[in-house]
Amino acid sequence: MKMNILLKRVSAIVLTAAMVAGITACATTTTATTTAAEATGAAVTTAKATTADTTAAAKAGKVYFLNFKPEQDAAYQAIAKQYTESTGIPVTVVTAASGTYEQTLMSEIAKTDAPTIFQINGPVGYASWKDYCADLSGSEIYGHLTDKSLAITDGTGVYGIPFAIEGYGIIYNNAIMTKYFATTAPKATSMDQINNFATLKAVVEDMQSKAKELGIKGVFSSTSLASGEDWRWQTHLLNVPLYYEFKDNKIDLGSADGTKTIKFQNSANFQNIFDLYLNNSVTKPALLGTVSVNDSMAEFALGQSAMVQNGNWAYGQISTVAGNTVKPEDVKFMPIYTGMTGEESQGLCIGTENYFCINNKAPAEDQKASLDFLTWLYTSAEGKAAVVSQLGFIAPFDTFSDTEKPTDPLAQDMLAWSSKTGITSVAWNFTIFPSQTFKDNVGAALLTYAQGQMTWDEVSKLVVDQWAAEKANTAS
């Protein structure tokens, strides 16, 4: 199995990226009632026509997409409705609750009407679901993939196709930051000066002491640690110190042997930023076990916080919060600084995590209908418009021109960061994390730590031990 995500290639796609036209389905109905015999004949004709229509619809197939991201459910529902109205092909979108995708997929895939399109999160996901992944090497959508090395491959087959290049970091409200820079004796006077952890920490702690003056409840939005709501920390944040560990030790991420164990040598750096989040927040650490991602994003949107860790996909959440006070031009990104040597040249975390797969156990007509739907989504004018404006994706396909890029501020700022001279993006290495169980256990440990019932040394040991245990479990 091969999965090669190279930052240079991802950056190239980010810089060059920004949906066959819809088929109109029409039907006419003619009714006539004269004699009883004619009526009977008409009824027979109608019955035959209905049967023929049903048979034709069955041959055309149907689509059942099991979506991974709750924040994009509304967009996918609208896209599905648009496609069905245009083509007559039924498209059902079901969205798993946050943090439950693996369990939901396991349950749904066993049903008679199983998902025809599902998602995996990289090589580890493929290892779990390869028996259900159809070979897409001959598909039109794979042909349009700008960088074929981004796909999930096994031998000569292609089993997972990436559909978006995304980025995450610390999102900040520039209006609040500008207000802070004008206070008495600020620890920095511009965002350009905040390019390492030491400066970030000084600024954040000073802002927290001036929270009332700045009109905020805390510098950072609440660190959501409710079960299923902790992925920003046990996956995205943990990626940063492990990225440096793999890089510094020249670990071959494509080698199973090379990633059997980790040292977690940058544990202190993880603690640096995690403690900064916890201690300068809207919510006290002991209460974080009930906080959701939506709660956290709402705090930012309502101007209660100045910063929040999340990705470019989060702008849809921010902009739709009732009472939102943050102007689009004030929503910007900065890297997640942790105190690593040379981090002044570190950029955002940019990569791809989720891949479309077609269920090879589904009826052939449903597999075809599902591929047709994805092809429409990423090649037709209507589909591409939905990808850009509704989903906000930067798509890795050659069907998108330079002008077909999301216009929301976070996508635009992500593109700007990826093109900065002398700045290196952090790769998404969490696609090789051992399992969802590993992530869940790390998340639970982080909550226990936040509540003061676990030491950081214990957290670090758990990360190392759980990594080794889950790598061994998934290999067996």
Predicted stretch roles:
Residues 60-62, 86-95, 113, 183-192, ...:
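A local structural motif
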Residues 11-15, 26-125, 138-141, 365, ...:
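Conserved N-terminal structural module of periplasmic/extracytoplasmic solute-binding proteins
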Residues 47-53, 57, 121-178, 330-337, ...:
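Hinge/lid segment of periplasmic solute-binding proteins
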Residues 77-81, 99-135, 144-160, 170-171, ...:
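Pocket-flanking alpha-helical
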Residues 86, 90, 111, 322-392:
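Extracytoplasmic/periplasmic substrate-recognition and gating elements
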Residues 127-131, 150-190, 201, 223-255, ...:
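Periplasmic solute-binding protein
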Residues 204-205, 248-290:
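Glycine-centered hinge/linker elements that transmit conformational signals in sensory
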Residues 350, 393-395, 399, 412-471:
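C-terminal capping/gating helix-and-loop segments adjacent to ligand/active sites or protein-protein/ligand interfaces
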